[in-house]
Structure formats: C-alpha cells, structure tokens
Amino acid sequence: DHRDLHSFPTRRSSDLAAARGLCGHDSGIACIMGTGSNSCYYDGKSIVTNVSPLGFILGDEGSGACLGKLLVGDILKNQMTPELKEKFLKQFDLTPADIIDRVYRKPFPNRFLASLSPFLAQNLGEPCVRALVLNSFKAFLKRNVMQYEDYQHQKVHFIGSVAFYYKEVLAEAAKEMGIQLGAIIKSPMEGLIKYHN
C-alpha cells in the first residue's frame, strides 16, 4: 500500500476515519497527506466521492513520496544550487548511483523517497525548495480538491505528517488557489476522539 495509513486496516475505513476526524458531523473535503496523498468529499455521515490518488508515480501530489521524487529529480538534474546538492548527498550519505538503485531496483521506492522529504522542511528558506513544495501542494489542490463539485463552498481539511509539518506552505497554496482551509492535524486520533465524544 502506498499511503501513510499505518493506523488503519483498510483504505476505505481509513478514509472514513480521516473524514470523521477532520469534519466531524459537517460536510467538507478531507485530505490525507503523508507518505502518499488522498482526498474525499464527506457529507457529514459518509464519503460521497473520492478522486483516485493514483500512487506516487502517476499522482499522490503533495505527498512525502512525491516531494522526495521531485527533490531527487531536481538534485540529479542540477536544478538546486551546488551547495544544496552537496548538503543533501552528505546528509543522507548517498551518491547519485545509490539513489538510482534505491528508486529502480529496491522494494518500496515510495518509502525511500518519502524518507528524503524532511530535507525540504529543513531548507524551506531556500527559494527553489519553497517553490518545489508550494507547486506540489498547488498541484494537489488543482488535481484533487478542485475536482469536487462545490469545492469553493467547502472547508478543506488535512491530516498527516506532510500537511502538519508544511502547514504554512499549504496555507499559502490554499490562499493562492482560493480554497477555504479548515483543520490541519498530524494524526487521525485527535479528530476521532472529538468525533466520538
């Protein structure tokens, strides 16, 4: 499974748990943004519709795996400053050959790529890094959230480590795209406790 849903037995129940934890008894758009990304429209009782996340190769915009993939692509194609490239390779003790091996020949490349994304959080002050994260979040909003009917009148809530640790950039992306940002929480338990009380 390519999503950050270790606390959940199945995708369907995890989406419902996330929606309930985020929206409570109100309608809204619930988004999961961790190793993978996902979203659904929730009517206050159940999930009405879901835009397929498509996994980290074709979709999963804004996820840790997608951010890691974009980061590695920019590092290997010299789109980051030489200083950032050197800092990245040194911090993770990697060579370009190691990266290719981990992505194309080893199992779970999505997890490997997601494990690199904290480098972006540590270097958000760099304009090229901030732009990479911002553009990935805007792509998530455009390709997922904006597909839901009446999205302009719904609060859009987020759960997951990526949404939580990059909440400032996520808020900037939402503002630029004209999206009403709701709650941003790290773990589903916070919201579920509130939902069931």
Regions found by a protein language model. Give the residues of each.
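Conserved acidic
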Residues: 1, 63, 128-132
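Short, small-residue-biased leader/transition segments that mark boundaries at the very start
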Residues: 1-2, 6-13
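Phosphate-binding/catalytic loop of phosphoryl-transfer enzymes
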Residues: 11-83
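ATP-binding/phosphotransfer module of carbohydrate and carboxylate kinases, centering on a glycine-rich
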Residues: 21-29, 70-197
